[in-house]
Amino acid sequence: MFKSPFFPVPYEHLPNKPKVRMVEPGKVDVPGFDVTALNLHHPGGSLAYRIKGANGDFVYATDHEFGDPSFDEPLAEFARGASVIVLDAHFTPEELPQHKGWGHSDWRQCAEFAASNDIASLWLFHHKPGRSDQALAGIREQAQKTHRATDTASEETTIDI
């Protein structure tokens, strides 16, 4: 995992050695937290996480390509009713057709998913590199027409649950 092409710095050169463990779908043992993982649709695999908080549940679902019911339906069940969801909105609807199979979604799919699954707050992230703040503001505005409580995640965004 800590080697090319997945990571730019070899493990032996890291100043601090992080503990790494494989996580499987299902209950995840994180002391002090109630965490569940679910497989997502992405080449090479990816997991979504649902973390139960005192004031609601947080779902983090990066690297997911909508369009395969065998992944989309379990994700809907997994995320339904969450207070907050963070979803991969890498592409615009216009860009997505040229990138089928890449394992990413567009902002419209994310807004429709959040609206149809009773999710209180949607945060779009995994923005395409080079997309300007102005373009992201336009995406946010468009997505809010489908799911009012939508925002675009940015560096240092914090969410309390």
Functional labels for PLM-detected ranges:
Residues 1-59, 65-70, 75-76, 133-161:
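Binuclear metal-dependent hydrolase catalytic cores
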Residues 59-60, 124:
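Structural beta-sheet core signal
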Residues 67-155:
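Cap/insert and terminal regions of metallo-dependent hydrolase folds
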